[in-house]
Amino acid sequence: MDVPEETRLRHKRDFIQFLDSMYMEEIKALVHQKRHRLIINISDIHHHFREVASRILKNPNEYMQSFCDAATEATRAIDPKYLKEGELVLVGFEGYFVSRVVTPRELLSDFIGSMVCVEGIVTKCSLVRPKVVKSVHFCPSTGEFTNRDYRDITSHAGLPTGSVYPTRDDKGNLLVTEYGLCKYKDHQTLSIQEVPENAAPGQLPRSVDVIAEDDLVDSCKPGDRVSVFGIYKALPGKSKGSVNGVFRTILIANNIALLNKEANAPIYTKQDLDNIKNIARRDDAFDLLARSLAPSIYGHAWIKKAVVLLMLGGVEKNLKNGTHLRGDINMMMVGDPSVAKSQLLRAIMNIAPLAISTTGRGSSGVGLTAAVTSDQETGERRLEAGAMVLADKGIVCIDEFDKMNDQDRVAIHEVMEQQTVTIAKAGIHASLNARCSVVAAANPIYGTYDRSLTPTKNIGLPDSLLSRFDLLFIVLDQMDAGIDSMISEHVLRMHRYKNDRGEAGPDGSLPYAREDNAESEMFVKYNQTLHGKKKRGQTHDKTLTIKFLKKYIHYAKHRITPKLTDEASERIAEAYADLRNAGSDTKTGGTLPITARTLETIIRLATAHAKMKLSSEVTKADAEAALKLMNFAIYHQELTEMDDREQEERQREQAEQERTPSGRRGNQRRNNEDGAENDTANVDSETADPMEVDEPSVEQFSGTVSAARIETFERVFGQHMRTHRLDDISIADIETVVNNNGVGASRYSADEIMALLEKLQDDNKVMISDGKVHII
């Protein structure tokens, strides 16, 4: 609106007095740093003249031009030559806006025409364009120059003017525009979206367009969390001959402040800090945090521990030579359906301060990284941030990772290691930060995990991608009656539980309510329905509340920066060398390739464990804890336990067969065959009736070969085939392999090896033909 001259001059005198009394040092610093915007704290205005502060917030258009004139005059009083003719010192605001600190969702029509502070994350940035402020035109006929000023809705110097260039003067003479004498200012539009962790569940995130001009352009980039101070205005719709009552709203910025990682930090009470330190001093702190992560999920203790370390993260470092050392931990879970992989992702979403969820089929490469889009109104190119850029310094959860296209999966390679997104499209070259942890869940390539194949063949992902995951867990659906009984009991307790108000649980479609920052309860209260009956002589395993767990993880993640000690460095280097040797040995076969990235993984895990203990140093104990987790992820113990149970079942079946009469007859037949093994006729009879030969041979040696030697043979033989990726091998080579690599006091005889191979053939695991063993 157009402010009367008398009112504007009165406000100018008041503001000059205010600046002389409180902001002379800031104005001198402005001149010294060659800036053209003075930032004023609204609290200082409130202390100087209380009533004016509230009027500035409610009706800023009346005061903005007076403030700029006062700041310009105060600057000229300090240095008359600092500003050129026609230049102004712009004014921006900061401070505590009380009820006017809003998110894009809360920015309603009540705030139109007033000054607000909008907090959110930048999702789109347009290119910086020049906007004309003053045009100069020359008339060749008269030799005179004509000036024209331009104002739009973003200007505070009066009513908006037309934007049409004059082509003739008042007398009808032609005018020529002198572009070199015209004045322009930088202009850029941004899109601010509400932060993902504060978005209402089940609803699309809201956004607001922001106009940044002059020195505010390029002050932020997509993915940055910002507080934008500005005036909320409504723009009339472009209607063709009809009246449109719906208006488009924009925010005209006068100050943009970047939010740091502590912006959304919870408020800690003294009791909270004492409780956090008490938990860190406990010997079972790691187990307690893992148990509290997702108490509704039974088992998976090692995976829960890995998730705790993942949320804490390591220490990010940027060396002087420009090298970036990643501190975030990436994790992947592969396994059978219905083993709570997706539920673990949901638990991360519920606890992590910043987490964005997506799925493999519903995500594209540009949707995860960044995209170059066209503005619907101007048609110009603009950069739009993807999920990983929006989750900067957070966690990205990708479910159904195996369903993602190969082209889209390649797009996240750079993010997972370099933690940046580089775009070079449509004339735009930019590099955006994407410092996030990736947690992926996938099913095996055949639907269920095939234990006879290597982990790499089951997963079906390239090594270039697998090596970027610090941890790879194989989650199996074990058919165990005891475990199944405990899982069913646990799940039934979950379904029977109701909270104190008798409700089954919160509805995801309820309006979002911000979490209070009051003192948090430490432990979950015992509930017989939820936690089960206490057994005699057994205490209830306590779990932390979700609110306190969030505070603990946030405190340990952002307040603690551990440093590696010499003894921890030596232990990590020694363990890495052992892992490399084991990776090249024929006795072992891990889920992940052992590369130099594995060494950095151990360092990150040890650092995260030190954070969990609130320690300023990474000790040898932290390195040992990281190595235990690393060994479980690489040489997954669940596979060995499952094979042991199958081996025990086979031994029981063999023992029962030995006690039957057919077993005794088989032994007698086997002895007769051994006595005539050089007879050609007997060899022909063996090939004519293979069933009579295979069965007794197994029964003969199953009674004489110990269970340990049987297990060693199958383990060494299977690992040799997986390590060298062989489909067939000669029996002579098998004898060499098992006798050179087997752990035992005596060597395997040829008959012993043949009997064991025939047993594998009966189990449909191998096929023996022409002196060769083929893997089925």
Curated annotation (Swiss-Prot):
The gene is MCM3. Probable component of the MCM2-7 complex (MCM complex) that may function as a DNA helicase and which is essential to undergo a single round of replication initiation and elongation per cell cycle in eukaryotic cells. Component of the minichromosome maintenance (MCM) complex, a heterotetramer composed of MCM2, MCM3, MCM4, MCM5, MCM6 and MCM7. Interacts with ETG1. This is DNA replication licensing factor MCM3. Residues 647-661 have a biased composition (Basic and acidic residues). Residues 643-701 are annotated as: Disordered. Residues 285-491 form the MCM domain. Keywords: ATP-binding, Cell cycle, DNA replication, DNA-binding, Helicase, Hydrolase, Nucleotide-binding, Nucleus. It comes from the Eukaryota. Belongs to the MCM family. Its main location: nucleus.
